[in-house]
Structures are given as C-alpha cells and as structure tokens.
Amino acid sequence: MKVRSIGFTKKVANLLALIVFGGVMPNAVAQSNYFVSSSSGDDKNNGLTVSNPWASMSRVSQEVLRPGDTVYFKSGDRFTGQLVIDESGTALAPIHFSAYGKGDLPVIDGAEMPGGAPLASVLIVDQDHLELSKLNIKNFRKKKRNGVVDTDAYGVLVKNTGKRNLRGYNFHDLVVEDIFPIQARKSFNKTSVTGIRFETHPAKSKKSAYNTGDIYIHNNFLRHTARFGIALRHGSSHIKGVRGSVSDYDVDVRIINNRCEDTGGTCVLFNGVWNGLLEKNSFIRSGAMVEPNLSVNRGSGAWFFRSKNIVAQHNVAIGSRGHNDSAGMHVDFGNENVLVQYNFSFDNEGYGTEILGKNKNVIWRYNISVHDGTRLVGVERPEGGKSSFPGKTLFVSDFSKPKRIQSKDIYIYNNTYVIAASSDPLVELNGRDMHLWNNLFVVDDGGRMGAKVTVGWQGGKVLDMQGNVFSGDVSPNFIRLDSNPVIAVIGFDGPPDKPETYAVDSAQFGTNRTGVAINHPIFRASGKGIFSHVAAEPEFDIFYNAIGSGLDVVGAGYRNKDLVLQP
C-alpha cells in the first residue's frame, strides 16, 4: 500500500505539472524512455535506464506518460497483470509500448493477475495516438474477478465511450494468442471475445456523435481465440441526423499483412467501418476447435457488416469450418461499395462467394476459389449437431434483419472456381441487378456443381449472366442461365493450395476463349486516402497480366511466358 500511495502522489503531481505547463510550453518536457523487467527490475527504480528498470505493469500504469514517451518491456520476461494505458500521445509524438533486448517477445498475460483475470490484458479507454509493437499478449481467463463478466475476454481492448473523436493507432509486430473466457456464451452473435478489438459506443445525441479512426494494424500474428482475431465495431446510432453519417462509423482502418490462424470464429470483422482496407493477410483455419467448449466454432476468414467503402485484396483464406458461413471471406448484410479482388481461398467448407442481403454495389472480381463449398447437411459435425446450410459455390442471399431485403448491383466476374471431387455445392442467386461475367467454373472428376440452382425474383431485372466458361459436371440448369456460355475441358496440375496452379494456359480454350466485353463497375472511393493505390477499374488480373494487353479475359488470370508472381 505504501508503494501505491507514493506512485499515486507522483502521478497527481506530474498531472498538475502538465496542466500548468503543458499548454504554454509543450516542448519543455523531454521525451522519455522507460524500461521494465520482471526478472531484474524494482518498482523503486527510476526506470530510465536498462540498468534501473521498473518491475511491474502496475508501476507503468502509475506513471504519467507524455507524448513521445516509450515504454520498453524486456525480451524474454513475463509480465502478469493488466497494462492500463490512460494517457494519449499526439499525431507527431505517439506514446509507444515495445520491447528491448534479445530473446523471445516479452509476454503480457492478464490471466495471471492477482485477484482474478481482467477483461483485457491491455486496456485503452478514450485514449489515442498510441503504438504497440513487439509484445506477446495473452489472456486465457480461468479465475473469476469481481465486476468482470466471465463470458468475455480480450487481448487488446480499445474503447471509445463517446467523449471525443479518437485517432492514431499503430499496432504491429505483435503476437496475440490464447484469448478465451472463463465460460462460453450461449449466443453466437453476443460472443465478442477478440485478440485485438476496437469498440466505439453508439451516439446517444448529436453532440456525442464521435468515432475512432486512423487505425493501422499490420504485421501481427494472431491465433487461438474463442472468436475473433481482429474486430472493429462501431455501434449503430438511432439518432436522426447521426445514423448513416460518417460519425456513425469508425473511419480509415487498415488491416495489412497479418497472419491469423486457428481462431474459434472469424479472423477479421469490420462492423460499422467507413473506409476499410484488408490487404495481404492470411486467414488459416478459422472456426477451429482449439478450445471447443469455450469457442463459437464457426468461421469465415473475414466479413463485413454495416460498412461503407471496403476493399479486400491480395488475401489468402484456407480451411474455414463451421455449421454456417465459413467462407474464405463474406459480405454480410447492410454494406455499400465493397470491392473484393485478387484473393485466394482454398478448402473453406461454407461458400466460394457469399453475399447476404441489403447490400449495394458489391464488386467481386479476379479471385480464385478452390474446393470451397463442401459442407454437408444432416450429418454429425465435429463440434456437435448437424448443419442445415449446404455448401454453395455461389451464395447471393436476401438475408438481412429485421426483414429480408435483396442486395442490388452485384458484380461477380472474372473469378476462377474449382469444385472438389466428391463435393456437390449448390448455387443460389437471390438479388437484384446481378451480373455474372467471364467466370471460369471447373469441376474436378467425381464432383458436381449446381444440383440445385435457385434464382430469386421479387420484380425488376435479376440476372445478367454471360461469357462464363464451364468445365466438368456442371448443372445444365446453371449453364442455361448464361446467354453466351463456353464449354471447355480444363485441367490443373500442381499443388492444390497454391494460386499459381490455377494460372490457366489460354490454349486450353481453343478459339472460344475471350469472354465478353465488360464495362467495369466503378469502386467509387478509389484513388484517395487509404485507397490511393486502388484503381477504380482493374488494371491487371490476379497474376499481374495487364488487362487489355491482348491476353484472354476469362477467369481470374492466365499463365504466360513472362508471368512473374508478386510476393
């Protein structure tokens, strides 16, 4: 108690000094580096040098950190308890938490906190301009803590309670793993357990309409969580004048070059995001049963809900499992202006392409889907129960809440779909103004596609389908929907889980191989902000062949003598 009293007094004194001098002489206080070592430190040290480190995270939390300060945790050490970050940096001088020394990343494990496991190992409430790097964050909660629900757990939790706009988060080179609650929730949709989570409260008035933005999460490794790897959720406001405005969304979110594997649920969720970029990530075995009694056991590499201006490109999704969803990626309901391109998905049992209801302008192009949509109904599943949601190669649904509403302006073109032997995926197309152009559908020997084909109609124009190529046992009912189909014999030779295997030799098409001319739909947010590198219209296929250079235009991409795959 004596040490805490001293720390509290120092914190108050430092805070008063900042109030008195901070606004007048913002550069008068030098930026400081602090060092923390659980193996050799002492909280009575000044913490300013490697030879005089603090020992605990509670000591870190007592210090008033200033913009530009850095707190270094010693590599190879283990820190038990919760890191509470209750100061903000600035745009030019963020506060940084990282590692020093050689060895394994320092471990921050909230689950071992005295008095019971906290909600999150790293907790940030209403603070911004922060950087986290080179830390191993865990929180497998097993001991109850007063005032903390047993059914939630987070590695890093960032909360915006609606006091102001929050900006500037740079989280990189982290390992976030083993994030599980004490007990599971019964409701799938109410389960929010996450490795890295941003949560923004919905506005209760126009004056409190704030959001969180400038979020950059990159080069991290996430695994073993009860549901999400990374999740961003801005609660939807019911206030007129706020609902649907940019203040009702988190803004400018970049999720780049992360690897996420063996999560109980989805690797990445965008819920209420305005301008979101999902690029060069790997989603491996979402819906995994690492801790089946604590997890939702229902995946999808990534999905988007109630969001605007979303780009998902150059991602890989492999091995999603679950009784529902479990696609490589899917567009849930209530989105607008979504571009999904240049992605590779393999062995995701739910769907090859999944787009639910109440969406506007969804563009799905130059993707490769291999052996997706294999889920069977009416058979016992590894997690228990039986699924009533059969696997589908194409799944455009009108599902939304509170009522079903068809999506409109759906463009699915120049994709390659490969259907696995011994699988029998269905097709459902239930939307308005849908376009299926120049896709390549190849069924491996022993497989079948489209035994049941459903096309929904509620009035108006439904389906414009032309220029697609079909190989193998594809339902005549599906082929007949195409006004200009091509039947071919296509085979692939190479590792099934490598995208380059599906770079088609254009000679296999003979003389009927060019598909139909396309007026490309426009991604309206291209060329500016976080989308400055995203073209409004595609300039190349998935294998970086220039579009319009005389190469064929069926499927996601072609092999040619000059083909060089990008990293």
Cite the ranges covered by each PLM segment.
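Boundary at the C-terminal end of the N-terminal hydrophobic targeting segment
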Residues: A28-S32
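Acidic glycine-/aspartate-rich tracts in secreted/extracellular proteins
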Residues: S39-K44, G76-R78, G89, G101-D104, ...
